[in-house]
Curated annotation (Swiss-Prot):
GO biological process: regulation of carbohydrate metabolic process
Catalytic activity entry: [HPr protein]-L-serine + ATP = [HPr protein]-O-phospho-L-serine + ADP + H(+); [HPr protein]-O-phospho-L-serine + phosphate + H(+) = [HPr protein]-L-serine + diphosphate
Location of region: Important for the catalytic mechanism of both phosphorylation and dephosphorylation: 204-213
The protein's role, per its UniProt record: Catalyzes the ATP- as well as the pyrophosphate-dependent phosphorylation of a specific serine residue in HPr, a phosphocarrier protein of the phosphoenolpyruvate-dependent sugar phosphotransferase system (PTS). HprK/P also catalyzes the pyrophosphate-producing, inorganic phosphate-dependent dephosphorylation (phosphorolysis) of seryl-phosphorylated HPr (P-Ser-HPr).
SUPFAM superfamilies: HprK N-terminal domain-like, PEP carboxykinase-like
InterPro entries assigned: HPr(Ser)_kin/Pase (IPR003755), Hpr_kin/Pase_C (IPR011104), Hpr_kin/Pase_Hpr_N (IPR011126), P-loop_NTPase (IPR027417), Ser_kin/Pase_Hpr-like_N_sf (IPR028979)
Entry protein name: HPr kinase/phosphorylase
Domain comment in the entry: The Walker A ATP-binding motif also binds Pi and PPi.
GO molecular function: ATP binding; magnesium ion binding; phosphorelay sensor kinase activity; protein serine/threonine kinase activity; protein serine/threonine/tyrosine kinase activity
Pfam families (alphabetical): Hpr_kinase_C (PF07475), Hpr_kinase_N (PF02603)
């Protein structure tokens, strides 16, 4: 199961959530991870002793209860209630940290952080952050581009010209997200987000030219940090026999499953004389039309069928 350390969570959100260490620095490597019986959204919540969260957030009501607990009003000790598995405690709303909670976290190597933000907002941000960071992921070989605001993954065997095609599309005003190793994350039940690893960001390898820095050559708008994957275009090598067998009037929708998410796919034969950049743009435009309920192939077949019926009726009504 994917997991991250408390240290990474702190580094990624320190300024956004105004986080500060209060105790438990030795537990900075505690892991926060997805459990089989708990979704990501259940990792964060207000202080709960019955169904403990991995990240326990102390708000106004929880702080008041802890103060009563420390004063002995409840008849319980910290150890009686805190004998639970948790990775991190955050005291929100700019509240002071009770000495009892600080001592308990220090003795048990539980990171204790403070934040000046209100606890509901703090939890919302952390849930979104964890949902993206701990999402199921996969790496696909190909080039990931933003074409007409649609996330397009171009795949195919090595040597078919994926990088050259990407370079042509970038020169036509489209944007590069990732080359070679595309990281895909399932951020929702039916949503895949494509990103590029920090090491490969901005770079595109083109045979004969080497490594190109796309941002430096084409400017800031030629690069996108991430994009939702909506369309896969698979390049295949085509010979005369393949082109003869190609069904040119198919209305069947092809999909490819990635991380149990079905993504629309299109197969483009690579042959001498074909302008692949124009074909990719046309495929994306056609996909956008289909999202609006318009299918050119189906429309042509319906028009063809109507014409056949009219011809048949005219033939029957023709006098002998």
């Amino acid at each position: 199961m994917p997991s991250i350390s408390v240290r990474r969570l702190f580094d990624d959100n320190q300024y956004k959530l105004q986080l500060a260490w209060a105790a438990g620095n030795s537990g900075a490597d505690n892991r926060i991870g997805v459990e089989a019986d708990k979704p990501v959204l259940a990792l964060v919540g207000h202080l709960n002793f019955i169904h403990p969260n991995q990240i326990q957030v102390v708000g106004l009501a929880e702080s008041e209860y802890l103060n009563r607990l420390e004063s002995g009003e409840t008849g319980y000790q910290f150890g009686d209630l805190f004998d639970i598995s948790m990775s991190l405690v955050i005291v929100a709303n700019g509240l002071p940290v009770s000495p009892g909670l600080r001592d308990y976290c220090h003795k048990n190597d539980i990171p204790l952080l403070t934040s000046k933000l209100e606890s509901p907002y703090l939890m919302d941000v952390l849930r979104i952050y964890l949902q993206r960071t701990l999402a199921a992921s996969s790496v696909k070989h190909g080039v990931f581009l933003d074409v007409f605001e649609i996330g397009v993954l171009i795949t195919g065997h090595s040597g078919l010209g994926k990088s050259e095609l990407a370079l042509e599309l970038i020169s036509r005003g489209h944007s590069l997200i990732a080359d070679d190793a595309v990281e895909l994350f399932r951020i929702g039940p039916e949503t895949l987000e494509g990103r590029c690893s920090p090491m490969l960001r901005d770079f595109l390898e083109v045979r004969g030219l080497g490594i190109l820095n796309i941002r430096h050559i084409f400017g800031e708008t030629s690069i996108r940090p991430k994009k939702i994957l909506q369309l896969i275009i698979n390049l295949v090598e085509a010979d005369d026999e393949y082109m003869k067998q190609l069904d040119r009037l198919s209305i069947r929708t092809e999909t490819e499953s990635i991380l149990n998410v079905n993504v629309r796919s299109v197969t483009l034969p690579v042959a001498v004389g074909r302008n692949l950049a124009v074909l990719v743009e046309a495929a994306v435009r056609n996909y956008i039309l289909q999202l609006r309920g318009k299918d050119s192939t189906r429309e042509f077949l319906e028009r063809h069928q109507t014409q056949l019926k009219e011809n048949e009726q005219n033939h029957e009504n023709r006098p002998d």
